[in-house]
């Protein structure tokens, strides 16, 4: 599951926020080492008792209380389903654009909307047909993406001056090419990308208009690095460059009125913020990892599998994304501003000149994305919805509900706010993991009453409602502590560290609350 398109794109926003490619990969690697440790620990009951997360979680949250964290985890998975479905839709959109002989664009347009709808329908077909119907595809998804990544690295290296020259291009991506000058709201900065010589701009003219439509009739002017432009309203800016076959145009860029003076966090907190976001990438899987580890042969096998398979794979596949994007800056003449850098493989492949190569490669993307999306983002939420109301919601109905929610979250917007989403997810799911681990290791010392996990009146019912008040209270307070920085600026750093804030707070509070709500049962080990 580490080999997927979101992993390919992980380093993109880190680099565009000012980090170097080495710093981005180090943060990804370190964050994955950190999150792998609790994933290994939380996978322990899966191996020992052979139980999935919705059953294991009953010990801490109650026989019915587990539905709350399961639903939170399910809603997050619905979001990821929507994002991956949008990516799959982009691949279909690229195929349609190629068949119609028009340039591919990754924004919201007719082809991409049609592609999204088609990919969603294909996904729902396999949900209704049952996950067994797609198992034959799951064996090919990771190898297909790995093979594609290797081929693109070879292509990028052979088509340019070598790996060093390619990676040097990351410096061009660390700020926007079209932006307001910091501290001067009337000064528009134009910094088109440059060729491999480091001197020749890839664009020579620019146009400014008050709307996207009016760019067609706008006057084109020679580019200077600084342009006096009164910032009295939103504007649209576009760059272009003459070529033997006509003009290459950048995508139109919208600039609103300049923001207030820069209040961005210091460099140290930028690293911490991205570190938290990268931990949040696996926040959902860290909670439900026992769904997978229950199939492991031993604790040693699940430990080795996670530590060997996760951090290194994430770093390597993220590196592929960085390298291929940087190579695209040198190879494709229509990539003339940093904002147009093709960070996702769909956009890279769509720029190849051979229609058959584009169609074949995008079909490979479809297969890989489809199998990964259903395995990682449909099974868990569909099961959670079904467990909540088993009389009314079957597994298939839960899968369709997952698909509907995946549309409602508007993934075409979320995909551009991935860092903010990951930090929010961290604040929601970190507390759940903290409670699970505090209960299993700190209180029960890994001892569970297996039969009791299936008894509505057993040791994990706690009360007539089947809800453990200690867990729910610790969860609410942990989430509130992690997310309070969203509304109170003075506590912003608590939000920047949302996974750690929520995890530690909820674990400690649960340990304090447990004996208070279980005075008659404090001596039991299960």
Segments predicted by a language model, with ranges:
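Membrane-embedded translocation segments of transport machinery
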Residues: 10-43, 66, 151-174, 258-406
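Membrane-water interface regions at transmembrane-helix termini and the short interhelical loops
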Residues: 13-18, 43-45, 60, 68, ...
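Transmembrane helix-loop boundary segments of multi-pass membrane transporters
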Residues: 15-30, 97-110, 132-141, 305, ...
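Juxtamembrane transmembrane-helix boundary signature
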Residues: 27-59, 71-86, 324-328, 371, ...
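Helix-loop-helix connectors at the membrane interface of multi-pass transporters/channels
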Residues: 54, 58, 64, 88-111, ...
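Hydrophobic alpha-helical segments and their helix-loop junctions in multi-pass secondary transporters
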Residues: 85, 89-98, 146-174, 255-260, ...
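Membrane-interface loop-to-helix entry segments
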Residues: 118-119, 123-159, 167-173, 306-310, ...
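C-terminal membrane-solvent junction of multi-pass transporters and transport-like membrane proteins
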Residues: 137, 144, 165-171, 435-512, ...
């Amino acid at each position: 599951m580490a080999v997927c398109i979101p992993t390919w794109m992980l380093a993109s926003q880190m680099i565009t926020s000012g980090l170097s490619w080495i710093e981005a990969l180090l943060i990804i690697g370190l964050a994955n080492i950190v999150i792998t440790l609790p994933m290994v620990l939380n996978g322990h009951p899966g191996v020992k008792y052979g139980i999935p997360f919705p059953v294991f979680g009953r010990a801490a949250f109650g026989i019915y209380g587990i539905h709350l964290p399961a639903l939170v985890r399910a809603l997050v998975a619905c979001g990821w389903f929507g994002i991956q479905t949008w990516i799959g839709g982009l691949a279909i959109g690229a195929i349609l654009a190629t068949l119609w002989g028009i340039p591919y664009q990754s924004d919201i347009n007719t082809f991409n909307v049609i592609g999204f709808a088609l990919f969603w329908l294909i996904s729902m077909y396999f949900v209704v047909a049952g996950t067994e119907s797609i198992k034959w595809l799951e064996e090919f998804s990771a190898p297909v993406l790995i093979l594609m990544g290797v081929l693109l690295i070879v292509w990028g290296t052979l088509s340019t001056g070598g790996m060093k020259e390619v990676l040097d291009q990351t410096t061009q991506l660390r700020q926007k090419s079209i932006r307001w000058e910091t501290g001067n709201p009337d000064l528009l900065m134009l910094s088109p990308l440059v060729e491999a010589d480091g001197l020749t701009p890839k664009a020579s003219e620019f146009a400014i208009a008050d709307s996207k439509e009016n760019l067609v009739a706008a006057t084109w002017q020679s580019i200077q690095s600084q342009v006096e432009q009164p910032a009295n309203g939103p504007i649209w800016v576009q760059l272009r460059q003459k070529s033997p076959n006509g003009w290459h145009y950048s995508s139109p860029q919208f600039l609103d009125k300049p923001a207030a003076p820069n209040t961005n966090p210091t460099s140290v907190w930028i690293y911490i913020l991205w570190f938290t976001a990268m931990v949040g990438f696996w926040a959902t899987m860290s909670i439900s990892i026992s769904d997978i580890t229950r199939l492991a042969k031993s604790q040693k096998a699940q430990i080795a599998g996670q530590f060997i398979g996760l951090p290194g794979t994430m770093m390597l596949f993220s590196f592929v994304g960085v390298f291929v994007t940087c190579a695209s800056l040198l190879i494709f003449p229509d990539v003339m501003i940093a904002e147009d850098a093709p960070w996702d493989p769909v956009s890279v492949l769509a720029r190849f000149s051979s229609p058959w190569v584009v169609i074949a490669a995008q079909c490979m993307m479809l297969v890989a994305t489809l199998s990964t999306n259903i395995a990682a983002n449909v099974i868990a939420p569909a099961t959670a919805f079904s467990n909540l109301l088993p009389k009314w919601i079957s597994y298939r109905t839960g899968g369709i509900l997952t698909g509907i929610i995946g549309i409602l979250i508007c993934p075409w917007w979320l995909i551009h706010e991935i860092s903010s989403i990951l930090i929010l997810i961290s604040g929601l799911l970190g507390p759940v993991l903290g409670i699970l681990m505090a209960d299993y290791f700190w209180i029960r010392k890994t001892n569970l009453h297996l039969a009791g996990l299936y008894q509505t009146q057993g040791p994990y019912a706690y009360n007539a409602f089947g809800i453990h008040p200690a867990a729910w209270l610790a969860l609410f307070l942990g989430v509130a502590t992690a997310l309070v920085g969203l509304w109170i600026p003075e506590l912003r750093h608590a939000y920047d560290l949302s996974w750690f804030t929520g995890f530690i707070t909820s674990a400690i509070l649960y340990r304090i609350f447990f004996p208070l709500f279980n005075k008659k049962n404090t001596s039991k080990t299960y």
